[in-house]
Swiss-Prot record:
Official protein name in the record: Tryptophan synthase alpha chain
GO cellular component, one term: cytosol
Entries under CDD domains matching the protein: Tryptophan_synthase_alpha
The protein's assembly and partners: Tetramer of two alpha and two beta chains.
EC number, as in UniProt: 4.2.1.20
Function: The alpha subunit is responsible for the aldol cleavage of indoleglycerol phosphate to indole and glyceraldehyde 3-phosphate.
Pathway named in the protein's UniProt entry: Amino-acid biosynthesis; L-tryptophan biosynthesis; L-tryptophan from chorismate: step 5/5
Catalytic residues (UniProt): E49 (proton acceptor), D60 (proton acceptor)
HAMAP family cross-referenced by the UniProt entry: Trp_synth_alpha (MF_00131)
SUPFAM superfamilies documented for this protein: Ribulose-phoshate binding barrel
């Protein structure tokens, strides 16, 4: 059983909701990426999404775009990100790590070489934003053969056919994009999210994580009421950008712990 599957099985057994923070590898300081990953885990992250910097991150809002640009300016590549996961695994063998990014860096490295290196480093899942599920059966199979969960995005505009396609090839969890547009946008409508989840659940036998537009513990709690997990990205990246260097890790841990407490109150209330 994969680390991701184990994690969600344990959460389900405890009646808890998953917390999935996102950070861009290499930003603000490539030398501290692993430290910040540990800070997220210390705060109560169930899964860590680690962003692979890319020059044209079309699905990301300005906060994550700029974060990606800063990481690229530091020379951070896909190989560096995989090396960060390997170092993280030296002292954390339990928290799943999902690489999130775009097709270009993987294709340049070669899918087979990527799968091999990612597996050896201890990567648990990969979410390629610009890979449509209809064209991804081979990629998904290659990842699963390497013990890596292929994770896919679904959106308010996803058709029943696309949802069913994801259900056939995805593993680990699915990431439901709660808003049309880019990451970091505002105006979350929890009732709209709640209305879409049953259609996903009926076709995809996996936990559903919801992200885009979740900026604080209160919003995270509301979203957790109707989902299996909450994904927070832009706010984490912003906190790292704004924090004094000496306080950055502690700031992350404190914020994640606040959200963790809010999510656990959902479980307690049930």
């Amino acid at each position: 059983m994969s680390r991701i599957k184990n994690t969600f099985a344990a959460l389900s057994a405890q009646g808890k909701k998953g917390l999935i923070p996102f950070m861009t590898a290499g930003d603000p300081d490539p030398a501290r990426t692993v430290e910040f990953m540990h800070a997220l885990a210390a705060g109560g992250a169930d899964v860590i999404e680690l962003g692979v910097p890319f020059s044209d991150p079309m699905a990301d809002g300005p906060v994550i775009q700029q974060s990606s640009e800063r990481a690229l300016a530091h020379g951070v590549s896909l190989r560096h990100v995989i090396a960060d996961v390997k170092r993280f695994r030296e002292t954390n063998d339990t928290t799943p790590v999902v690489l999130m990014g775009y097709a270009n860096p993987i294709e340049r490295m070669g899918t087979e070489a990527f799968a091999k290196a990612a597996k050896e480093a201890g990567v648990d899942g990969v979410l390629v934003v610009d890979y449509p599920p209809e064209e991804c059966a081979n990629f998904a199979e290659q990842m699963q053969s390497a013990g890596i969960d292929p994770i896919f995005l679904l959106a308010p505009t996803s058709t029943d056919e696309r949802i069913a396609e994801v259900g056939k090839i995805a593993s680990g969890y699915v990431y439901y994009v709660s808003l049309k547009g880019v990451t970091g946008a505002a105006n979350l409508d929890v009732s709209s999210i709640a209305s879409k989840i049953p259609a996903i659940k009926s076709r995809v036998p996996l936990p559903v994580g919801v992200g885009f537009g979740i900026r604080d513990a209160q919003t995270a709690r509301s979203v957790a009421e109707v989902s299996d997990a909450v994904v927070i990205g832009s706010r984490i990246v912003q906190l790292l950008e704004q924090a004094a260097p000496e306080a950055a890790a502690e700031t992350l841990t404190r914020f994640v712990a606040e959200v963790r407490e809010a999510l656990d109150s959902v479980a307690t209330a049930r």
